């Protein structure tokens, strides 16, 4: 048995245990997935994330957690047609610092391929750790444009048969279809199959499309600023300032900090053989939190809550160790990570550990190696 006092002293960074739950060291990246309701689209059910027959909504959320949490540009999540959205959260408050941007939203935009998403933020006013407080849109370049529709509402209907085009109707009296694109995406349905309801209604702002073209040639130019998946990730246009927040009447609102981010697809547009415009997200970063440097001779220690789900990204040969509060090693594993290509960039696979065999308790985690990241299943 390892002496607990010696064990604690052997680490350079230790997180703090508070009350009935445990808090990790602050991550600069989102650490929680609360909601995911994509509108219908050509990638829905097929990928980003893929749907397996019979999967529940919670299982879909777990797939998102495995690819989105704890790092940037980890995996792509598709939000589908206009209104489809995701709600994410940080393990800390993102500070609104004066005269600088505060957040970066990662997507997969490149030259003339913008698929803009509207970004909203919320502060945990009631302190319950849930995104149930008011939301504020970060007003981008086109928020006050006459062509932008505020208070837009659109409903999508489950197709019958399931592989049919998806009908939509809006509050302006217009209607249309999310068209099948079977040459490239021939899954059973474009309507999210884990959603039990036969219709999905979304509300928000709708931008006028900038896309143009026809036949085999289409372009979708970026908006000036203030939208997700609009500019490449290395462009300042992927950055956001909390000072852009406005209320439902379009009046500026000052937020000293935020905890939650909601993003939804901002346009309703079909681009021929390219299919519908659908915002895609691969991560969100707090630009004011430094990424911890584990170093080659250092270790990372965090607490594992009673959820007992763990996500690890580390090079092959790194070792994960789990200790109980008496200092006894209760689980260890050598990381045998492979790699995947994401937009031409080689990335480490995120390994998921389900430690359900451990009694519900508090555990200490250590990841040793040249570098790495740990993300627990606290949701």
Please identify what each model-predicted range represents.
Residues 1-26, 291, 311, 350, ...:
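Bacterial Sec-dependent N-terminal signal peptides
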Residues 18, 126, 142, 337:
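Residue-level detector of flexible, active-site-proximal loop/helix-junction positions
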Residues 26-115, 134, 139-288:
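A domain-level signal for the mature, folded cores of soluble proteins
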Residues 86, 115-117, 316-321:
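Short beta-strand/loop motifs in extracellular/secreted proteins, especially
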Residues 120-124, 323-325:
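Predominantly extracellular/luminal cell-surface or secreted proteins
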Residues 125-134:
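Acidic, glycine-anchored loop motifs typical of Ca2+
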Residues 288-294:
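Short, threonine-centered small-residue motifs that mark membrane-proximal processing/anchoring sites
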Residues 294-379:
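C-terminal outer-membrane/trafficking sorting elements
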